[in-house]
Amino acid sequence: MALWMRLLPLLALLALWGPDPAAAFVNQHLCGSHLVEALYLVCGERGFFYTPKTRREAEDLQASALSLSSSTSTWPEGLDATARAPPALVVTANIGQAGGSSSRQFRQRALGTSDSPVLFIHCPGAAGTAQGLEYRGRRVTTELVWEEVDSSPQPQGSESLPAQPPAQPAPQPEPQQAREPSPEVSCCGLWPRRPQRSQN
């Protein structure tokens, strides 16, 4: 009982102490286009990740996106509206020092419909020969296949053997079928589990 009474003032201070305004702003806008507008896309050594912006930077981007979307569109008239990029797809990468000025920031903006943005997350492979790409929660893997060319000289002369066709490499299965989905993707429910087929 005495321990609880000692911790009561500390709990009261924690309850009164508000969260960081940038974190609170990001927590309020965790769905749809606001998610992209309130975050920086940063390239790290293990792939791309998002960090929250301050409230002022996010509001400036929203105001500029609204003024740009009200101007005339540069898209061709024949292009379908669903094929356009969403207006709120604002990808911001901080390529300067941490805490640098806004002149060191590279901003790329695409205008279009108000659909929710499609986010690509790039995770390079461990050996550098495979690249992982996540598209709406589905993992796409592309691998580099090296083919060895037989450059040994053919024996010439009276003992020449009949010409043999060069050895063809065995066809490799598709990387999608050969790999199991990674456990960190399947545990979140993003990757649909395939039923195991019974071999009879």
From Swiss-Prot:
State the tissue distribution.
Expressed in pancreas, eye and, to a lower extent, in limb.
Q: Which gene encodes it?
A: INS-IGF2
Protein name as annotated: Insulin, isoform 2
Give me the segments passing through the membrane: none
Q: Which Pfam families match?
A: Insulin (PF00049)
Region of interest: Disordered:
148-200
- Composition-biased stretches, type Low complexity, lie in 175-184
The Gene Ontology terms for molecular function here are: hormone activity
Q: Where is the composition biased (Pro residues)?
A: 163-174
- GO cellular component entries: extracellular space
Which cysteines pair up through disulfides? They are none
List the source organism.
Homo sapiens (Human)
